[in-house]
């Protein structure tokens, strides 16, 4: 037991690692699905709007928790609803319109365990979607180390104070 952490760690795995197409523009994803895997599934089904996920390391559940995003897109832009369990064990579905999203956070209780989510894409051209994913990957490679293991981004951009990205502010200091 870890005496430094007063809580429970839950790892959702195999049973929460499924993706399915509900109809021509809606995807349902388990919370353990890797963000990039969801973007590739959307590509195979000619759905645009998920391209940015190809550049985000992490899972769907984590992405929803922090409203992860990059290149001007965030989870809130594609989320229809999230299915969760509250601390009493009740399963609930929360429509995205009932969630207050902000930069890298939302107002959902930290006690919720996200199980799955539904997302809406837009029918698109496979080649254009793939090209956009490639373009975003190249842009990320120019601005971030992608060939070595890192802890990822540890800073939030101070959007209320400046238009500059935090890495630029650090470099300039």
Where are these predicted regions, by residue range?
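Short, well-ordered alpha-helical segments in soluble proteins
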Residues: 42, 60, 64-68, 83-86, ...
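Phosphate/pyrophosphate- and phosphate-bearing ligand-binding catalytic cores of soluble enzymes
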Residues: 85-173
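Glycine-rich loops and low-complexity Gly/Arg-rich segments
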Residues: 13-18, 36, 53-56, 76-79, ...
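Short, low-complexity, polar/charged sequence segments that are solvent-exposed and flexible
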Residues: 10, 27-31, 46-50, 69-73, ...
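A gly/ser-rich beta-alpha-beta helix-loop segment of oxidoreductase catalytic cores
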Residues: 44-45, 49-80, 150, 156
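Structural signature of FAD isoalloxazine-binding scaffolds in flavoprotein oxidoreductases
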Residues: 1-17, 65-95, 109-116
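Anion-binding (especially nucleotide phosphate/pyrophosphate-binding) glycine-rich loop
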Residues: 1-60
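N-terminal short leaders/motifs
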Residues: 33-40, 63, 68-70, 106
């Amino acid at each position: 037991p870890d005496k430094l952490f007063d809580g429970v760690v839950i790892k959702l795995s195999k049973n929460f690692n499924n993706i399915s197409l509900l109809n021509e523009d809606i995807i349902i994803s388990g919370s353990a699905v890797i963000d990039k895997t969801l973007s590739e599934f959307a590509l195979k089904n000619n759905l645009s709007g998920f391209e940015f996920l190809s550049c985000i390391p992490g899972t769907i559940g984590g992405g929803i928790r922090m409203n992860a995003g990059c290149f001007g897109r965030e989870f809130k832009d594609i989320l229809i609803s999230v299915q969760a369990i509250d601390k009493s064990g009740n399963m609930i579905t929360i429509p995205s319109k009932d969630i207050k999203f902000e930069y890298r956070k939302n107002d959902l209780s930290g006690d919720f365990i996200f199980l799955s989510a539904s997302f809406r894409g837009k029918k698109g051209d496979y080649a254009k979607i793939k090209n956009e994913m490639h373009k975003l990957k190249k842009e990320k490679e120019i601005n971030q180390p992608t060939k070595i293991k890192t802890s990822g981004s540890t800073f939030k951009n101070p959007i209320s104070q400046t238009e500059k990205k935090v890495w630029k502010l650090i470099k300039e200091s």
